[in-house]
């Protein structure tokens, strides 16, 4: 019934809902090096994450800053119909693997979130993003993973620019496909609780062990002096 309802809603919104790749079918590449121990290095501040209006997978309007502050965040841009094995499916499989590790680590519970945001608001409606996220998009007792989109490309553009994420239409609409192929360089951003980007991962560095040690490194940093972190009920829900 839920699947049928999702399909009906997707048609009503003018887009077909796409399921996320099956993580077990996507092998995360072996790491060719041993990452340094958490806290043995420093991650410099690269830039402040941009802000803007986004749509949650339930259709509610929010500000992006609600999902990039208050916790250590792994943020990435995706599109639901991406089939490049070194693109969005790899990011999904890597984060899925890391999510399980974080949920089994008591010291990390409640301190980390994941955010995946669509490149393509025309096709990736809230319904499509909710379908893509599947069980990962449903908040439970574990790490919360948000699947966001925007109302249109005009509102998305400043956020893409702010993150330095390029995307282009690589080809016209292929036969049998609803949308053009989007060409982009895979990037996953690590943000601290203040919304500062502290690391940017490409395919070569995107591995659960690397991400985990970087998250632990950020969480070991002392809180800024004279600054109190006040989390509202809205922020603590993310």
Regions found by a protein language model. Give the residues of each.
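Structural microenvironment flanking redox-active thiols in thiol-disulfide oxidoreductases
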Residues: 90-159
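N-terminal targeting signals for export/organelle localization
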Residues: 1-51, 55, 233-238
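A local structural motif
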Residues: 46, 140-145, 170-176
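Extracytoplasmic
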Residues: 47-49, 67-74, 109-114, 124, ...
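Short active-site neighborhood of thiol/selenol oxidoreductases, capturing the structured segment around
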Residues: 64-94, 114
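Thiol-/selenol-based redox modules, centered on thioredoxin-like
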Residues: 161-238
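Sec/Tat-exported extracytoplasmic proteins
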Residues: 47, 71, 78-81, 86, ...
């Amino acid at each position: 019934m839920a699947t049928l309802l999702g399909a009906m809603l997707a048609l009503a919104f003018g887009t077909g809902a796409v399921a996320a790749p099956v993580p077990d079918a996507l092998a995360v590449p072996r790491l060719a090096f041993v990452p340094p121990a958490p806290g043995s290095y420093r991650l410099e501040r690269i830039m402040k994450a941009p802000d803007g209006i986004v749509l949650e997978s339930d259709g509610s309007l929010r500000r992006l800053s609600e999902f990039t502050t208050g916790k250590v965040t792994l943020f990435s841009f995706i599109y639901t119909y991406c089939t490049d094995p070194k693109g969005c499916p790899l990011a999904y499989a890597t984060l899925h693997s890391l999510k399980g590790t974080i949920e089994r680590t008591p010291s990390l519970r409640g301190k980390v979130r994941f955010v995946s945001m669509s490149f393509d608001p025309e096709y990736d409606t809230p319904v499509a993003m909710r379908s893509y996220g599947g069980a990962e998009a449903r908040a439970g007792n574990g790490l919360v993973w948000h699947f966001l989109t925007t109302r249109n490309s005009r509102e998305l553009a400043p956020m893409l620019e702010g993150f330095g994420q390029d995307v282009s239409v690589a080809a016209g609409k292929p036969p049998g496909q609803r949308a053009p192929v989007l060409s982009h360089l895979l990037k996953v951003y690590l943000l601290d609780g203040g919304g500062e980007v502290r690391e940017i991962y490409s395919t070569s560095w995107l591995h659960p062990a690397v991400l985990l040690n970087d998250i632990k490194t950020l969480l070991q940093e002392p809180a800024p002096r004279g600054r109190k972190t006040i989390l509202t009920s809205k922020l603590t829900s993310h």
